[in-house]
Amino acid sequence: MCSEFWSGWFDHWGRKHETRPAKDMVQGIKDMLDRNISFSLYMTHGGTTFGHWGGANNPAYSAMCSSYDYDAPISEAGWTTEKYFLLRDLLKNYLPAGAALPEVPAALPVIEIPEFHFTKVAPLFSNLPEAKHSTDIQPMEQFNQGWGTILYRTTLPEAVAVGTVLKITEVHDWAQVYADGKLLARLDRRKGAVSYTHLTLPTN
């Protein structure tokens, strides 16, 4: 049994969309059917991994996109593809006598959204929940938060010496550093930027 016969592959942030030739996928399925091997097609319909459940690969950190398209025979939008029709044509040959496949449903319609303009804004730093206080930096799990984003904030002394350096280590997986609402730096684990030891803080 093949528990996961992949129609495509993972998509990772910052990389091109992964595809697999339709003929290669269909030939692999034919080889299994001819040998009476059970299989599960992963995926038949490319869906979506909602929220922050995309995951990542290690040891060379590579964050996965939340899309579950996987170059599947039925796309994330629910549309049939060349791969779908090649697979359908193959499966016709393995139906019991007298059986037939149902008609393919019409493609889902696409709506057109007229142009619009935003007229209101809600600044992030002006709309934060009540803070929790700690003398040490705690991981988000300590706040019963398994994923997402967390804000660490502190108040610096009024007089910050010239050349004062902020040291950040082991970022998982993305960080932005602000001082008085001004963006100073970004750290991106995908690019190997997991620490920052040369961030000079403003003195005013």
Question: Where in this protein do the model-derived segments appear?
Answer:
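Short, glycine/acidic-rich beta->alpha junctions
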Residues: T19-M25, G148, T169, K191
